[in-house]
Amino acid sequence: MTTSRRDFLKFVVAGSMSAGCPLPHSLRPVPDEPSAQIDGDHFAICHEVRDGTVFEKPPVSKRYDVIVIGGGVSGMAAAHFLRDHNFLLLEKEPHFGGNAYREEYQDQGYATGSAFDEKDTESYQLAKELGMTLLPIDCWDPSIIRGEFVEDTWHSGLDHLPYPISVRSAFKKFRTTLLEMDPEKDAAHLDSFPISDILKSYPPELTQWWDAYGPSNWGAKTQDTAALCVVEDLHFNGGEEPDVRVTLPGGNGALAGALAKSLAAMHGERMLGDATIVSVDPQKTEVNVTYFHEREAHTVAAKAVIMATPKFITARLVAGLPDEQSSAMRAFRYCPYPVVNMIFDKPVYNKAYDTWCPGNAFTDFIVADWVLQKNDKAYKQKNNILTFYAPLSERERPLLLQDESCQTIAENILRDFRKLQPAFRDAEPIEVHFYRRGHPMYLPVPGNFTKRIPTASRPMDRIFFANTDSIGPVSDISAAVVSGRRGAEWSIRRMGNSSASAERLASAVGIRV
């Protein structure tokens, strides 16, 4: 974590920009292989891993039943379901949680990424198992458009959009049209074209709204979003069912923290952070994994390995991938994603949980303690913490490499927030916490769900591919837990039946192959 003091306020920058970081400066590639340029900038080293540099691999020093690579919710869920087995969980960051990571300001939790769950999902059930009570949000999302607060955007708010009657009618028609579509029966068709093909027949105000909503929720604007995603989402957010979303301060980082705490209490010696994986090598009866920790290389082996890592890095670590599968993994696209928490010493905004603001330097913002305000009568807010989501386009990823450009992003967010409504004009945070991730969410481009994911996620003989980009159609907390559980079940079956095909075992645990 790096900390920078800024003239205009306290400005804290944190987060990881590369799935391969950090590598220690002492590493050297195998002779006669391309040299890694090690000049103090760990991003350059990470890119050597990304580009396929081969590092020296020491002999196997220890063996396990299962090695889980990736300490996000997917990897930790796999470890949780493997708790009766001899597992090792490896994570490149010093902390566990991945995109669901909770931070605090004076004991007040706030999210740095993944924000909420839904009732009765596998992740919700896991939270209950861990003794957590996720609280209902019970607040359909409003929007602030042209200075107007529009409550419950896709229900009653459609009559109050600050647009001409013709545009309001178009919003209603769009909602009605998509609610008539069946995202289950027509999944293959709806996944074959972008939602922009439908939106081009509507006024541009609809595209502007979805071009804010899409990047925040699944990393892509309308031209890169399969229609399936919007149809599914509108059935959830624009249908007649009540709001079933649940959360806690810190978002899904609360679940990640509870998982990490539970695992550490039972199996802390099997959890290793700051461990940078450089190779995953299948052998005849096991899989070798080489990683660096505290400047030293280690190779360990297991009967099965679960790759709970994004596909773009998985493809660069696992040896022997079939060409078709490697190509599918490398075809995944990921958005760069800063999340900015602004901490105020007086109330600024507490009208809704998640408010959409199309056309600004941020897409939406969340009231960090919303569910405590609404569900705990004794609760009193100490600081008003607002979490601003500001996903970038892929070409803007380099902006996150420098603190100065991160500061500019934060300043632009504050500028646009102040312009939203007169009440915000003098809003002055006492601190700004900037969390950056280079590749947190895969883009749900057409064909991703029905074609690319099944190909990319096909298990190898002793390697299972977990992570949310093994489920789809978008990245969410429930998919992380589902993929982790499936990975654990698959690994247990593999250990119990070494002769069964990987695909047969995959079908047994519900994998599309």
Question: Locations of the language-model features?
Answer:
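Active-site/ligand-binding neighborhood in enzyme catalytic cores
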Residues: 182-279, 286-288
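Mid-domain catalytic core of redox enzymes
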Residues: 60, 273-386, 420
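Glycine-rich FAD pyrophosphate-binding loop
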Residues: 83-103
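Extreme N-terminal leader/targeting segments of oxidoreductases
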Residues: 2-64
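Conserved flavin/dinucleotide-binding core of flavoenzymes
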Residues: 30-54, 354-356, 361-362, 367-513
